[in-house]
Amino acid sequence: MSSNNQESLANRSHTVTVSETSQILQLRANQTEQVPKLAKKEQKSKVRWDENVVDNEHMNKKKTKICCIFHPQQNFDDEDGGECEHASSSASSSSSSESENDTSMDFEARRQARIARRRQKLERKRSSSPNAYEYQPDYSQYRQKYLHGDK
């Protein structure tokens, strides 16, 4: 019967439950040691805005960096073609042109003046040289060298 007993033991399954306790290591500073605090001179100063700092579009976002370049409108009512572009733009450095600020003109007259200025601006010939974003380098000479094997 010992062989039967061994077979019955082999067919049995045993469940063993092992319980582990997790150990947590907590590090604490020694109570006698004190962490040195920063002196008042070393503390980081906070930004304080003057009253003359402009609020960015009334959103309480005050910035010190310039985020865009302002190009004042040019006054096209003066037909002086001899003036250079930067001189005329600095001469009309107000936020809008004179015709828009002119209260003697009604809405339709100001509108027509704006349309005329816009047409003049579009009709002016742009310089033929491309700007930095439009410039495309010419690699044709390199392409021909590598295609023909003239390395």
Swiss-Prot record:
Q: What is this protein called?
A: Type 1 phosphatases regulator YPI1
Q: Which gene encodes it?
A: YPI1
Q: Name one Pfam family in it.
A: PPI_Ypi1
Top-level taxonomic group? Eukaryota
What biological function has been recorded for the protein in this entry?
Regulator of type 1 phosphatases which maintains protein phosphatase activity under strict control.
Tell me the PANTHER family matching this sequence: E3 UBIQUITIN-PROTEIN LIGASE PPP1R11, E3 UBIQUITIN-PROTEIN LIGASE PPP1R11-RELATED
Family of this protein: Belongs to the YPI1 family.
A biological process from GO: intracellular monoatomic ion homeostasis
* Low complexity compositional bias, start-end: 87-98
The GO molecular function terms of this record are:
protein phosphatase 1 binding; protein phosphatase activator activity; protein serine/threonine phosphatase inhibitor activity
Q: Where in the cell is it found?
A: Nucleus
Polar residues biased stretches: 1-34
Biased composition of type Basic and acidic residues is found at 39-56
Alphabetical keyword list: Nucleus
* GO cellular component: a single term: protein phosphatase type 1 complex
Query: Which stretches of sequence are listed as region Disordered?
Result: 1-56, 78-151
Q: For bias kind Basic residues, which ranges apply? A: 112-124
Which organism is this entry from? Eremothecium gossypii (strain ATCC 10895 / CBS 109.51 / FGSC 9923 / NRRL Y-1056) (Yeast)
